[in-house]
């Protein structure tokens, strides 16, 4: 059984990517695993039967339950300085989540692909920033001003790596 948004996944991720129907039949989903600077994470792509929306949920299950106050500080800062994704921490399993929803009803697959996957790459960078900032905060105990300075330097370095690695065959600069 295929979903009408399967071509979007195929073009944006890999040819074998396709949505699977949930057990209760209300939603369709696909899980993409990706590697980034701070480790391995996943993204759940969810939609409904009609393909009226596409929700992306990034998750990292390795955050753990130690240093929760520092993590919540970083999450609050990042939720406050950008509005592209919302971050959540699940106390029950020690996982970090980031969500963003796109209304895609009435759009052509190519439009959806361009809209979603450009933002997906940016979401992964922002997600990596939160994990990096959390690690930095735990290691240094620094204040907010020092955190912003360190994060700006981290992002400059990321941009340099992406620019340097563009054009290397088989290399995706989003994972630099």
Please place each PLM-identified region on the residue numbering:
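Short, surface-exposed beta-strand-loop junctions and turns on beta-sheet-rich folds
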Residues: 37, 62, 104-105
């Amino acid at each position: 059984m295929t979903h009408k948004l399967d071509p979007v996944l195929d073009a944006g991720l890999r040819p074998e990517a396709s949505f699977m129907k949930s057990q209760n039949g209300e939603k369709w989903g696909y899980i993409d695993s990706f590697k980034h600077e701070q480790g391995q994470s996943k993204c759940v792509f969810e939609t409904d039967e009609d393909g009226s929306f596409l929700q992306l949920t990034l998750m990292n299950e390795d955050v753990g339950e130690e240093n929760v106050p520092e993590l919540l500080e970083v999450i609050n800062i990042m939720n406050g300085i950008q509005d592209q994704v919302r971050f959540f921490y699940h106390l029950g399993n020690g996982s970090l989540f980031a969500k963003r929803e796109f209304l895609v009803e009435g759009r052509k697959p190519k439009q959806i692909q361009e809209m979603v996957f450009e933002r997906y790459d940016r979401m992964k960078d922002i997600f990596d920033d939160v994990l990096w900032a959390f690690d930095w905060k735990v290691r240094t105990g620094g204040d907010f001003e020092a955190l912003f300075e360190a994060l700006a330097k981290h992002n400059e370095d990321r941009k340099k790596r992406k620019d340097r690695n563009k054009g290397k065959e088989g290399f995706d600069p989003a994972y630099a």
